[in-house]
């Protein structure tokens, strides 16, 4: 069976990139593909400047299929359509061949010291633990580093997994600044009606009265 991967957002009103079967080789498999016919993409930095291939920033799109705007929300529309490009809120990069690689949502990125930490990478590692049903990774306040990594975990029924054993298990599986410094065990991760994980709900108890550098 030949598998074709596509990627799009509600705001793109359909698929915007495609990774056809013939490109399922080597590192290209980690990509969501290249923009489809009539679509364009680029990656921008903190000041909306264009970034070179391989550098992580915000993925932006342009094309005829993009939304006109958010209903009755002109300010929100203006914020995401700066410079006639749709700013997706996705962090990622484009390689020299024009393939797009998504790292995470920018608002979920953790700023720990001088490092940008992408929760999706950590979640993928933790999810491979046999005692973990599902997990989420968030940033919580830290006086020294600004933010540190916390894992929120749903473990299998009857599991004896502890915070200490999970942190030790992760020690040789990821860089030190990516490893969780603390773990919460809960019965169920919060989700909205469509099943989307609500990381803001997980972060809120730790950030009351404080301001994140990422929002």
Task: For each feature predicted by the language model, list its residue ranges.
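Gly/Ser/Thr-rich phosphate-binding loop
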Residues: 1-27, 40, 47-48
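General small-molecule cofactor/ligand-binding pocket signal
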Residues: 4, 183-186
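Active-site glycine-centered loops adjacent to acidic/histidine catalytic or metal-binding residues
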Residues: 8, 33, 90, 114
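Short Gly/Pro-enriched turn/cap motifs at secondary-structure boundaries
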Residues: 30-36, 50, 80-84
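AMP-binding/adenylate-forming catalytic core of the ANL superfamily
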Residues: 47-50, 63, 68-69, 76-79, ...
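Acidic/polar alpha-helix N-cap and adjacent early helical turns
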Residues: 205-215
């Amino acid at each position: 069976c030949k598998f074709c991967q596509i990627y799009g957002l509600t705001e793109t009103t359909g698929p915007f990139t495609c990774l056809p079967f013939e490109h399922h080789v080597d590192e290209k498999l980690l990509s969501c593909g290249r923009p489809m016919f009539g679509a364009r993409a680029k990656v921008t930095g903190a000041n909306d400047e264009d970034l070179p291939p391989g550098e992580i920033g915000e993925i932006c799109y342009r094309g005829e299929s993009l939304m006109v705007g958010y209903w009755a929300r002109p300010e929100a529309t203006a914020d995401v359509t700066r410079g006639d490009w749709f700013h997706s809120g996705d962090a990622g990069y484009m390689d020299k061949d024009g393939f797009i690689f998504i790292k995470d949502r920018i608002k979920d990125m953790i700023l720990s010291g001088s490092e940008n930490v992408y929760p999706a990478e950590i979640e993928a590692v933790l999810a491979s633990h046999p005692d973990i049903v599902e997990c989420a990774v968030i940033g919580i306040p830290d006086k020294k580093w600004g933010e540190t990594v916390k894992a929120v975990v749903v473990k299998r029924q009857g599991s004896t997994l502890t915070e200490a054993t999970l942190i030790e298990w992760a020690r040789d599986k990821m860089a030190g600044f990516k490893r969780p410094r603390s773990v919460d065990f809960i019965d169920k991760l919060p989700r909205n009606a469509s099943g989307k994980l609500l990381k803001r709900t997980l972060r809120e108890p730790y950030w009351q009265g404080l301001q994140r550098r990422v929002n």
